Amino acid sequence: MSKAFLLWWIQVVTVLFAAILIFTYGWFEKLWDSDQTKISFIIITIFIATSIATGFLSFRSDTQYIKLSNYIWFASETMVTLGLIGTVAGFLLMLSSAFDNLDVSNVENVQKVISNMALGMSTALCTTLSGLVGSVLTKVQMVILENNTKYE
């Protein structure tokens, strides 16, 4: 086993431990409820796929797999882009229905508007956070791989 694979494995175990904690505290359910676009789960799926591919690359460091690393770097940037798309979508959700039929004299109506705005804002923030975290973790894996693997 190579040093790159062992370092990859340490990161995977750490991420799995964090995922178990997140699942235990019910944060996945909160993410599911907060993200109306579900882009966060697309980002999580991309992260899992790139982590598996990075582990494969770190286990078998042949020159024929160098092209695959370019796709992983691209996927890392795609996670950030999807996070930003989710941010825009969340703000659009927040502003699209925020002021329709707003009657400031009716307290219940104002509470409903604020609730709708909070839902759009939570979508925006959840997708941004998912995209940034997924991208950073993928980039860390790739830097470890490239610094500890010798392609002949």
Features from the language model and the residues they span:
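Hydrophobic alpha-helical transmembrane segments of small proteolipidic membrane proteins, enriched
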Residues: 1-152
